[in-house]
């Protein structure tokens, strides 16, 4: 803001970081302060698949809405593919109900034999019954665990996605700490909607956000290097001399 106030255009400013999940905190502040930005070689934090999935589970608990339902009903796989979803959509239109209610009503239908539909409904009902009494951070951790979502990511070996979920949990915890008594699930979901619907008018005068890897061979007038702390940069995965050398090379790229 100080630089911009002195006449520097946003596009001359670049923020570098070691790992993608760092962007969450930077993005939240930039959005709050109305600083335009663009992420290079990465997806905005709240638009990442695993973040959208996690938030869809929370929305399903609170609202049981169709968009959230379609996003996670078969993630992880529950054998609820296109044919069964089409059946639910037709039923929902005919009976003017939500897809979730359509599924709940038809659990005994032959079409859902051999699926995990009943377990899915039981899971959501279990959380929906008492979510208002639980902390959002605890709710999030529990649903990601009990739904099998985190296990699915571990099985796939998606460490970056797990790191992003850990960052989401941290952001929920920070949100609770700042809101105190007012931190209801509904309140949080409307707060987070501000970040997920961020399609501000596109003008190219934006601060660039990118990893140090992406910045190799590039130069910018103003560079901010953030989160240079032990465990982030150098990465917590640095357990050999060779890996530490690689971290040093990356730091050199960032500085030069």
Regions found by a protein language model. Give the residues of each.
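Conserved motor-region signature of P-loop NTPase helicases/translocases
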Residues: 1-68, 155, 159-160, 207, ...
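Coupling/hinge elements of helicase-like and P-loop NTPase modules
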Residues: 1-12, 94-107
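Conserved, well-folded catalytic cores of nucleic-acid-processing
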Residues: 2-6, 29-36, 57-60, 64, ...
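Accessory C-terminal helicase-associated subdomains
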Residues: 68, 76, 105-214, 218-219, ...
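C-terminal helical "lid" of AAA+/P-loop NTPase domains
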Residues: 86-92
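Structural motif
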Residues: 222-224
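C-terminal accessory regions
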Residues: 227-256
